């Protein structure tokens, strides 16, 4: 029988990877709920974000995205990070390419529209004061698809389901409140 040993360095790197992944998840939840304060926790102070529609201070992006989404009629959205390649460039730095899929329902002059966007977040992460967060982000869009929405809020069994919201009235806030 062979025994396997894992070094403390390997354990520490695993913890670092998990901290980076957790940061990516905070970003997704923050942007989906249009929660600027939660969104800011994904970025170091002074970080930058280039999203095309916005290129500048990441904390300003966190304040910008809610009013911007409202101005284009966003009613619901889901950001997913499906997988991420994390390469450490030093003890406290990493570059991360994470694949993103976003689903958006928006109210337009022609009715509800559905968009799917596939892209990647190209991030420079840094660990400062023990916290892994984004220092710089570039969003790269690889493809998109736009079509009339077939969203059905009232039909069949949908009418009785709890509804997701893009604000702090979403059901998840009550569930997660003791932990935040």
Model-predicted segments: where are they?
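A solvent-exposed, acidic/Ser-Thr-rich amphipathic alpha-helical stretch
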Residues: 36-104
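Short aromatic-glycine motifs in intrinsically disordered, low-complexity regions
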Residues: 73, 110-114, 126
């Amino acid at each position: 029988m062979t025994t396997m040993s894992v070094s403390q360095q390997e354990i520490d790197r695993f913890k670092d990877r998990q901290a980076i992944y957790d940061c990516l998840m905070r970003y997704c939840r923050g942007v989906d709920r249009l929660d600027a304060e939660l969104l800011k926790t994904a970025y170091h102070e002074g970080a930058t974000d280039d999203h095309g529609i916005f290129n500048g201070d990441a904390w300003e992006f966190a304040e910008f995205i809610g009013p911007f989404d409202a101005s284009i009629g966003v009613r619901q959205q889901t950001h997913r990070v499906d997988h991420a390649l994390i390469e450490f460039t030093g003890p406290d730095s990493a570059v991360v390419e994470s694949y993103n899929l976003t689903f958006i329902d928006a109210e337009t002059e022609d009715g509800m529209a559905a968009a799917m966007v596939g892209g990647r977040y190209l991030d420079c992460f840094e660990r400062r004061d023990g916290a892994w967060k984004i220092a710089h982000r570039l969003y790269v869009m690889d493809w998109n698809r736009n079509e009339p929405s077939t969203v059905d809020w009232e039909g069949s069994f949908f009418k009785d389901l709890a509804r997701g919201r893009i604000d702090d009235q979403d059901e998840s806030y009550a569930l997660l409140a003791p932990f935040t």
